[in-house]
Structures are given as structure tokens and as C-alpha cells.
Amino acid sequence: MNMIQSAKDQIAALTRSAYRAAVQEGLLPDGVETVPAVEIPKDTANGDYTTTFCLAASKAMRKNPREVANILTQHMKLDGTYFTSVEIAGPGFLNFRLGEKWYADVVEDVEREADAYGRGEGLKGKKYMVEFVSANPTGPMHMGNARGGVLGDTLASVLDWSGANVWREFYVNDFGNQIEKFAKSIEARYFQLIKGEDAVEFPEDGYHGDDIKELAQAFYAEHGESYLDKTEAERHADMARFGLDRNIPKMKSDLERYGIKFDEWFFESSLHESGFVADTAKKLTDLGWTYEKDSALWVKTAEIMRDQYRKQGKKDEDIDKLGLKDDVLRRANGFYTYLAGDIAYHRNKFEVRGFDKVINIWGADHHGHVARLKGAIDALGLDGTNRLDIVLMQLVKLVRDGEVVRMSKRTGKTISLSDLLDEIPVDACRYFFNAKPDTQMDFDLGLAVREDSENPVYYIQYAYARICSLLKTVADEGRSVPATDKADLSLLSGEQERALIKELANFSEEIRMAARDYDPSYINRYLMRLAGAFHRFYNACRIKGEADDVANARLLLAAATRQVLANGLTILGLSKPEKM
């Protein structure tokens, strides 16, 4: 249960009921809309919740807000609710103070729901796909892939905890120009092995990394010089397949090491081989969205994007300045472009597989493609405007001792995901990369391996381990944590106890907001606050040496905190160490 929402709902109901009673007595006019806005004030010294209803409704009632507030408070019946008092503040705020029943219900909810505590049903019945990483399979994964990987994975978790049926997908770009370039790069290195580096020119736009040399060496070890006599087309096809067959399993292995497993690795080539790309181009043509020029098939991208920008509220004179141009779908040589494949892929997501919502995690450098793709899906009649969402993530810088790090100490090459995981614990990588997507981030390599409270991962996991140690000590002494119905939770009335319970109650709301904003870093920040609230409680509230009833209530609160920390760590894909 979302206890924050339950409290807000009660205040809304109390306000509506008081208003109706006042109307019946002729004290307030009828016909005023009663949808009270209820918030948690920044300063809770005067109350735990507040509503501005009296301020908002006073004009329609033709009364002073404080007069409205006075009338409503006289008609509010708090018996049986979560609240012990309601007070008028300032120009007409109504401030409500929580009673012990709410605090007890939070702890009871955690005990009852256990591993499911925090789960909601706001997206129940909705079929979501999160497509992320989708790194080029022609080489090692980089820091952008590392960030996109954890953002996509934790966003999928947040959506799952919000009730959605979630599908994680990796789109494998195994078709087109980059694969041809990949094959030519391996081919050139293969020829150089046989004829010498100076005898064979390497393609200027080829892939220059050592990984290509290693693939060429492996290909030569397996096939010798036999491919000198093959046709270029045979060499390119076989070398590309050879390279992909080695790179893709390595990518899967690195991602699984990173804690990421996909429901499907979807291959771009399957869309071309099945004719689905050609069929999608035909459908766009039938709908009037293409034309032929210079023996190529063009899509009316400028018109499509103009429609998209208008939907975003942009004015035509501003759109004109963007210099929008149409794009080629099928080249004069008969080959389809990457855009054609991408449109077909997203048509497949909606039309063939029936996803209600598709979320793509992209680097911010792809921002220009957003309106183009959403508009193309609109053009197909599949409502890309509302069903396709793109999360754009900013750049990552690796920093050590205040200096930007570009090369791996171990390999001397640009740092790959695999290199990073060799140096930094997976938990730290996942936590630090799960930063707010639209902010550029500096990944502090030194901080990530520190074992003190400056490292947020350590700080959170230490809170979890501390509770485990406490409960083990209690068990070793022959005591157990009582069930909530066997304990007097009203004894949890101290400042630090109630602050901790309020933080436990926030968990469901944090998940809801993370899903709403496509920002799983809400959970990072929440766990830091929860760990801090626990450490303050632990330092202020003794358990050993206290009377049994007080000790039992505090043990229950500690156990509830461990449960919520565990659930949050599960969402983030982090481990739960019982000792540190």
C-alpha cells in the first residue's frame, strides 16, 4: 500500500466531507469543485501534510480563505483517521498532523508485503518495451553503453515494480554500411598478415582498433590463406559473420557480468531478410509519404518532422530555421538505408508485437533523430507521438584525482566496459552510472572504490549490513523479532523513529515518480536518505538495555528498514552484503 497516497486520500475525503456538511448548513455555497491539492510541506514543524484548498476555493465561494478554513475545520471529524489534529496556518493553509496509527500501519505494511513492498499497480496491464544499449557489434562497448545499460535496466525494473509487463531488448545492428566496413577492416588486416602491413592499404574509414587485428589473426589461424582465392563478396560475408559470432557472445558476457540480461537480442538483418523493411517502405508509399527522385525512394521527412515539432508547440517560423530535409529510404542501388530499417523495427514493436509503450535509451547526440522516428511511426498510423518515448542521456567522463581518464591502465587503450568492470566493482558501476539521464556526469573512479561513508554505495550497503548484524546478535542471544501484532508500535514516537518510518513510507511514491519521469535515479537518492535516516535512528535509539516492549518495537523498525533497503537494492540490481 502507498501510505503517502493513503494519507493524501484521507485529507481529500475529509475536506470534501466537511465542505458538504458546511453546504448543508448554509455556511458555504454549493457548486464549488472539491479536488483538494494535498502536499507534504518542506517544513513539517507545523504539520505533516497541508492542503491549499481554502486558498484555491475562496474566490468561487466569495469568502476570505481563513474564513473558509475556519468553517471546514469545525466540520472535520478526525476520529478513525490517520490524523490527530488539523490547524489553520498563514493565509488559509490547512495543516494536518499524523497520529500513531499511520506510523504503525507503515511498519505493518512492510512486514506484510515483504519482498513486494513498494510494488504498485499504476501500469498494470500495460505492455512496455525498454530497448537499450543496442551497441554496434563491430567492437567493444564504451562508457556510453555502460551508462545506457544501467539506465535501461533499472528503468525496466522501476516500470516492473509499477505494475507493467516489461520486455528488455537489445537491437543488433548486423546489417548495412557499418557491417560492410567491419568486414573490409578484417579483410585488410587479414591481407596484411599474409602480405605485410606496408603492402596492403587499410581503409581510411575502417575500424582501427586492436580488436580488429585480433579477429583477423583468429580468422587466419582457422582458415590460413584459403580466402585469398575467394570472391570479395564471399570474404566480406564470411568475415563479417566470423567477427559477429565472436563479438556478440562477448557483449552478452560483459553485460551479464554487469548484471544485465535481455529478453531478446533482435537482429536488424531479420527485418531485411523477411522483407519487412521493403513492406514498410511500400506501406509508407501507399499512405502517400514517399516519392522517387534520382532513382531513389525518399520519405517526406521534412513534412513528418514539421508535424512533430508543431505537436511540441513550436511555431512554423522557428521550424523553418531548422532546415528540415527529406531522407532516402531506398538508395538508387536498391539497398535500404538505416532509417528504413529503424522505421520497420519500430513498426514491428507496435504492429506485430503489440507493445503499448516503447522506450528507447539513446545518447544525446541522437536528439535529431527523435522527431524523425516518432513522426514516421505517426505516418504509419501507430501513434508514435504518444507510444514511443526516447530517453536521451548525456555524456560520461571518467575522472581520477580530478583528472579526466581516457585510457585503461591495463591495456593502454580506450576504456571499454570490460576494462571498467576489471577495475571497479559492479555495484559501484551500476549505482554511479544510474545518474539523472539528462545531466552530464563525472564518474569518480577513486570514490567508487572507497570503503567509507563518502561512497554512497558503501553507505547504503553498510546500513543494510549493520541491520543484519544487529538482528544476528539478537538471534544469537535467543531473541527473535516479534510480529507487528505482538508489539506496541505506539512506542515508536521519538523524532528519529518517526523520521525513519516516514522515509519507509516514501518508497512507493519514489518508485511511482521514477516510472513517471523515466528517471530511476530517484531510487539512488531515496536509498541514501533511507540509509541516513537509519544511521541516525541507530545512533539515537538504543535497543540493548531498553525495556522489552521498547526494544521489540525498535527491532521491528530495524527489520522493516532492512526489508525496504533490500527491495531498493533489488531494483538497482545491487548486492545485499550481510557483512562488511
Q: Residue locations for each model-derived region?
A:
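Non-catalytic interaction-recognition regions
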Residues: 2-104, 111, 115, 119-580
